[in-house]
Amino acid sequence: MGSKSVVDMIEAASRAHFSGLHVNGHMNGLEPSALKETTSASEDIQRQPFVIGVAGGAASGKTTVCDMIIQQLHDQRVVLINLDSFYHNLTEEELARVHEYNFDHPDAFDTEHLLSCMEKLRQGQAVDIPKYDFKTYRSSVFRRVNPTDVIILEGILLFHDPRVRKLMNMKIFVCTDADVRLARRIKRDTVENGRDIGTVLDQYSKFVKPAFDDFILPTKKYADIIIPRGGDNHVAIDLIVQHICTKLGQHDLCKIYPNLYVIHSTFQIRGMHTLIRDSQTTKHDFVFYSDRLIRLVVEHGLGHLPFTEKQVITPTGCVYSGVDFCKRLCGVSVIRSGESMENALRACCKGIKIGKILIHREGDNGQQLVYEKLPNDISERHVLLLDPILGTGNSAVEAINLLISKGVPEGNIIFLNLISAPQGVHVVCKKFPRIKIVTSEIDNGLNEEFRVIPGMGEFGDRYFGTDDD
């Protein structure tokens, strides 16, 4: 660290500073010219739907599963889009030899059109989805699909293209016995599509079965959930619906990042946020209500620690079956704002060890000064990283990288803060997908000065009473 002393570094960090790391007026890794686009993207994501992909072999029960999910979620919130709608129209030459056309091959689908429609729906635009006629082998009519909370995509090869998989928040594979699927296919194609049984069996042995083995079954590994017996598995479908309902009640970023947790909002929490965000709130009230909120965040964060079952004898002589939480724990505060969260952690965890990290950039060359004082055995502990504001995410990344370099497993870090900007959430969660983030609210984004908006100003200055005003 050259001639700079630790005292000088802490003094520098005590002056007015922003939540992100800055170099020559620019946020590290993000140019100001791109700020509006980034902020806009973070706002768009809050309008994006929860996308469920349902794949599996032909006649495995995918449509039945989708219908049951829709019925339990209420159809006004859900739209079903079938991959069959995106078959290519057959040419005259292909129509003349239609029985030799492989409808179960990835090339039979217009994947680009599907991606285009999904992109528009994710941007809040209505789209026209084609309706494929299996008697004429053409799309002659369209149906208008409006943006909605939940989009269910269904199709045999839905997981084949990685670009389509990337759109999905949940991937379900319906697994049904091959004989059952064949019997269903014979019934469907002869009764509904007017085909003769000989043609159906010939197509099954020539195209359907090889396609399942070559293209469909290998994509089973991408599924988040595998449902045996399709629509007959009511327990699995009930669990899926419960999970979807939970996700619908969460902030949209929580649907994308499963390790992001926003504590349940109540009028008490909203009221405390109103007070600490108010520029006219006195220092005494700001500290009082900040401490209350910090305590709630810390308690919620502790709930994500591993535990073991434990039985105790109560004063009445009865046995109580409870849990025993992880004892190998420490806190690490990011100087200076993070120190405001230490008292709440000590109040919740008697005698807990707390380390400190200082990350600061100064000068035209953007030299980074880092000071750290951490427990010697930190690699053996679960770590609660304390910083009340997650802004650009760059300071958090530096702190997390330091912890990992000290041997702390990524999955052992829980990052606690009061408010988070979507940009910071993206940066941290994409780089460290196993880290848990616990926050009390997610704000709109960052302004041109890289401050969280609506935000609460410079937290450290307001909490420790070092405002320049």
From Swiss-Prot:
GO terms for biological process: CTP salvage; UMP salvage. Its cofactor is Mg(2+). Binds 1 Mg(2+) ion per subunit. The magnesium is bound as Mg-PRPP. Keywords: Allosteric enzyme, Glycosyltransferase, GTP-binding, Kinase, Multifunctional enzyme, Nucleotide-binding, Transferase. Disulfide bonds: none annotated. 5-phospho-alpha-D-ribose 1-diphosphate binds at R336, R361, D387, T392, G393, N394, S395, E458. Uracil binds at G457, E458, F459. Residues 259-469 are annotated as: Uracil phosphoribosyltransferase. InterPro entries: P-loop_NTPase (IPR027417), PRibTrfase_dom (IPR000836), PRK/URK (IPR006083), PRTase-like (IPR029057), Uridine_kinase-like (IPR000764). Allosterically activated by GTP. GTP binds at K283, R292, C326, K327, R328, L329, R381. It is an enzyme of class 2 (transferase). It comes from the Eukaryota. Pathway: Pyrimidine metabolism; UMP biosynthesis via salvage pathway; UMP from uracil: step 1/1; Pyrimidine metabolism; CTP biosynthesis via salvage pathway; CTP from cytidine: step 1/3; Pyrimidine metabolism; UMP biosynthesis via salvage pathway; UMP from uridine: step 1/1. Residues 46-249 are annotated as: Uridine kinase. Pfam families: PRK, UPRTase. It catalyses: UMP + diphosphate = 5-phospho-alpha-D-ribose 1-diphosphate + uracil; cytidine + ATP = CMP + ADP + H(+); uridine + ATP = UMP + ADP + H(+). Its EC number is 2.7.1.48, 2.4.2.9. One of its GO terms (molecular function) is ATP binding. In the N-terminal section; belongs to the uridine kinase family. Involved in the pyrimidine salvage pathway. The uracil phosphoribosyltransferase (UPRT) activity, that catalyzes the conversion of uracil and 5-phospho-alpha-D-ribose 1-diphosphate (PRPP) to UMP and diphosphate, is unsure. This is Uridine kinase-like protein 4. It comes from Arabidopsis thaliana. The gene is UKL4.
